[in-house]
Structure formats: C-alpha cells, structure tokens
Amino acid sequence: MKQFLDFLPLVVFFAFYKLYDIYAATTALIVATAIVLIYTWIRYRKVEKMALITFVLVAVFGGLTVFFHNDEFIKWKVTVIYGLFAGALLFSQWVMNKPLIQRMLGKEITLPQEVWSRLNIAWAVFFILCGLANIYIAFWMPQNIWVNFKVFGLTALTLIFTLLSGVYIYKHMPQDDKH
C-alpha cells in the first residue's frame, strides 16, 4: 500500500498531462502529493522526511510553474530533489562519518563498513547521473519526451538500481543472515 501511495502522484501527473497539459498536470501533482501526505499522516501518524521534502519541493516548484505559466520550474524540481538526495548521502559519509544508507538499513542488515560506504557512494552517483540526465532531457528534448522520461524512465532506472543494490547487499551479507 505504501509503495502505491508513493507512486500515486506520479500516475496522476501523467494522466493529467495526457488529458490536458503540463499546467493541469502540475496542479494535479501538487494536490495528489498533498492528499497522499495527509492520508499518510492520518493513517500512520508519521510522515517520512523524504516525503515531506518532496512535497515542499513539489509545492514550490509546481506553484511557480503554474503561477508563471512556465514549465521550466517543474522540470528543475526533479534535478533539485536528486541533487539534495546525492548531497545528503555524500554529507552523511564524508562529514557525519556514517553513510545514510547504513542509517536507513543498518538495523535490519549487517554489512561491512566498506560495503555501506560503496553502496552510499553508488546511490549518490546514481542520483547525480539521474539529475544530469533530467537536465539534458528536460531542456533539449520535447516536453512529452521529458514527461515520459520522468514517469517511466526514472522510475525504471530507480527500480533497476534498487534491484542491483539488493544483489550487491546479498552478496556481502554474512552467511547466517542469508537464510
């Protein structure tokens, strides 16, 4: 259910884009993200920081897109979010000396420190590359290509990278934890 809720605003954005235009889609994205956030709070009495940050960025960049009738703002939102994620991962590793990935998964999974560090850096690089790809596609390709990339391309890339991360984690888990 949680994963469905996370993807619902993206589905709403895509549907409204196909039915109307980027501005209706952006308005629908803001509303859908707010509804999911409120529902999550009511249902679980907790909202993850990432969901809150995403909502704020959707509201700000989406609001600017609709207000100025300029789709460049919503296109930048994707890169800004990925940049923040990459920055948080790198900050956690180099300044806080404990990879954010380890903070998120370390209670459930036991891995050597160097594996946590590699995984953390890999995700940071992934987010940086996705952000750069978004800039290229958003500003040098037609709008419909960008929407498809945002909805399907980035989602597929994230799922593939998550699966590859899972394989990498499994490969480095202690034998007794694999059962």
Curated annotation (Swiss-Prot):
Keywords: Cell inner membrane, Cell membrane, Membrane, Transmembrane, Transmembrane helix. It is found in: Cell inner membrane. GO terms for cellular component: plasma membrane. Plays a role in cell envelope biogenesis, maintenance of cell envelope integrity and membrane homeostasis. It is a multi-pass membrane protein. PANTHER family: INNER MEMBRANE-SPANNING PROTEIN YCIB, INTRACELLULAR SEPTATION PROTEIN A-RELATED. This is Inner membrane-spanning protein YciB. It comes from the Bacteria. Its main location: membrane. HAMAP family: YciB. The chain crosses the membrane at residues 22-42, 50-70, 76-96, 121-141, 149-169. NCBIfam families: ispZ, PRK00259.1-2, PRK00259.1-3, PRK00259.1-4. Belongs to the YciB family.
